[in-house]
From Swiss-Prot:
A motif (GRM 4) lies at residues 174-184. GO terms for biological process: adhesion receptor-mediated virion attachment to host cell; symbiont entry into host cell. A motif (GRM 7) lies at residues 202-209. A motif (GRM 3) lies at residues 157-171. Belongs to the receptor-recognizing protein gp38 family. This is Receptor-recognizing protein gp38. The gene is 38. A motif (GRM 9) lies at residues 223-228. A motif (GRM 10) lies at residues 232-246. A motif (GRM 6) lies at residues 194-200. A motif (GRM 8) lies at residues 214-220. It comes from Enterobacteria phage Ox2 (Bacteriophage Ox2).
């Protein structure tokens, strides 16, 4: 909600909005300096504040829903625990151009990480081309400077998946599908009869060595996955590593503190 416009019962409306009966205290809640006119309260809203703890399967739709729930009011997110998007295909936080808030603040506490999810390792079985997938993005910003970021922690794009390879040691031998490793964090392994590893929160999945064929390891925070390669034998498909995700993409936010960032940003 917001304080009613002029003409209207601004005094009682401001009490309902801020919970403060003293004009000076209500002005503080509405981010107005003192002295000021009560008419300046019209149409203003107090900040809506949310605190987010750790969640390694965070759905960015929750974040978007809270923004719309607040209407035009400014909204603040205090991030106190590590967050990882539930999907490499969905940014951790996303703000399209229709986001209604006066402004959106992200306060990322010290030691806290915000992650895009890691990309999957490439595979050559089932028609796969062997290429690792791109890592996930952290923040999609389409509201420009209305997004204000104070990063005392870490914003880390998901690492890309490693490349897979189809290999046989000599003509007449059976083709072997060797999957790539997953990007950090939680990127899936490429699979196949042989495969690199899935990523954990702490690190990317490794590649797999089979004779002279080598699938690529997944990428670390903000890094591309490793290409597959061979140093002998016959190869049918040699996949490249996936690119990292973006830490912040779209339009430039207002940076209060840039802090530590892995991956491209605007």
């Amino acid at each position: 909600m917001a304080v009613v416009g002029v003409p209207g019962w601004i005094g009682s409306s401001s009490v309902n909005e801020t919970g403060q009966r003293w004009m000076s205290q209500a002005a503080g809640q509405l981010r107005l300096g003192v002295p000021c006119w009560m008419s300046q309260f019209a149409g203003r809203s107090r900040e809506i504040i949310h605190t987010l703890g750790a969640d390694h399967n965070f759905n960015g739709q929750w974040f978007r829903d809270r923004c719309f729930e607040a209407g035009s009011a400014p909204i603040v997110f205090n991030i106190t625990g590590d967050l990882v998007s539930y999907s490499k295909d969905v940014p951790l936080f996303f703000m399209y151009g229709d986001t209604p808030n006066e402004y959106v603040v992200l306060n990322i506490h010290g030691g806290v990480h915000m992650w895009g999810r890691g990309g999957n390792g490439g595979y050559t079985h089932s028609g796969g081309d062997g290429n690792g997938t791109q890592g996930g993005h952290v923040i999609q910003n389409d509201i420009g400077g209305r997004l204000r970021i104070w990063n005392y922690g870490v914003i880390a794009a998901g690492g890309g998946g490693g490349g897979g390879i189809a290999y046989r040691p000599h003509s007449g031998a059976k083709w072997q599908d060797i999957g790539g490793g997953g990007g950090r964090p939680f990127g899936g392994a490429g699979g196949g009869r042989y495969s690199g590893g899935a990523a954990s929160y702490e690190g990317p999945g490794g590649g797999y060595d089979y004779g002279n064929a080598h699938s690529g390891a997944g990428g670390n925070a903000g890094a591309a996955g490793q290409n597959a390669w061979s140093d002998g034998g016959k190869v049918l498909k040699v996949g490249v590593g996936g690119a990292s995700g973006h830490a912040v993409f779209g339009s430039s936010p207002t940076w209060g503190v840039v802090g530590t960032i892995y991956g491209p940003r605007v």
